Design a protein with these regions (language model features):
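Amphipathic alpha-helical assembly/interaction segments
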Residues: 1-115
Length: 115
């Protein structure tokens, strides 16, 4: 693989980030909007940063950070539904995608060859 842009998990997490930003456009709570969009942006950003470090151990570390951000994002999506800041159907779709991305990240971590 020549570039992080070729990773399916990066592509999907980037699309999810865009979806989260769109879902939060009308959000009246600026603090919530800022926190959830930061979590969403953290996923593809950490995948890219880890890949560009050119070190297996660094890549794994950043993939784990991205995986943690998936959990943070899912939590914020659930809370956004419950407090009425996010449309349930849109947020549920994002929750499902974040869970799949988390699984993909773990699979990638498990498949990376040793140094």
């Amino acid at each position: 693989m020549d570039a992080f842009e070729q990773l399916e998990v990066w592509k999907r997490s980037s699309r999810l980030c865009v979806d989260v930003y769109k879902a939060c456009r009308g959000c009246s709570d600026a603090g919530f909007r800022d926190q959830i969009t930061r979590a969403a942006l953290s996923v593809p950003s950490n995948i890219a940063e880890g890949y560009e470090r050119n070190s297996r151990s660094a890549f794994v570390q950043f993939l784990k950070i991205a995986k943690g951000s998936c959990g943070e994002l899912r939590t914020q999506l659930y809370i956004g539904i419950e407090i009425g800041l996010l449309e349930r159907s849109v947020a549920k779709t994002c929750i499902a995608e974040a869970a799949e991305i988390s699984k993909m990240l773990q699979g990638l971590i498990n498949r990376l060859p040793p140094n």
